[in-house]
């Protein structure tokens, strides 16, 4: 005869895998065309000069150069550009 009451079950104990979002190349870093600069959900950062934007809003370099982050416009948007 068991002398311990059966334990209850739980509906917790799960978590999703991290998506590894964020800035991959910082301001002043050299990049080659095609390098990913920022992985993001939505446009937290906007594409500036020589920067392309992917289907999932990933920003990537269109040319070789140095990464430049800047805040501009009436809404203080963050832009990422590539300078030669």
From Swiss-Prot:
Gene3D superfamilies: 2.40.50.100
Region spans: Disordered: 1-22
The organism's place on the tree of life at top rank: Bacteria
Ribosomal protein among keywords: yes
Molecular-function annotations in GO: structural constituent of ribosome
Keyword terms of this UniProt record: Ribonucleoprotein, Ribosomal protein
GO biological process: translation
Annotated GO CC locations: cytosolic large ribosomal subunit
HAMAP family with a match to the protein in the record: Ribosomal_bL27
Entry's family note: Belongs to the bacterial ribosomal protein bL27 family.
Protein name (Swiss-Prot/TrEMBL): Large ribosomal subunit protein bL27
Organism: Shewanella amazonensis (strain ATCC BAA-1098 / SB2B)
């Amino acid at each position: 005869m068991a002398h311990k009451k059966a334990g209850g079950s739980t509906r917790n104990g799960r978590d999703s895998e991290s998506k590894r979002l964020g800035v991959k190349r910082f301001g002043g870093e050299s990049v080659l065309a095609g390098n990913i600069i920022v992985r993001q959900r939505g446009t937290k950062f906007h594409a500036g000069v020589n920067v392309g934007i992917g289907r999932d809003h990933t920003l990537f370099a269109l040319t070789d150069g140095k990464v430049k982050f800047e805040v501009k416009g009436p809404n203080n948007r963050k832009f990422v550009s590539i300078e030669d």
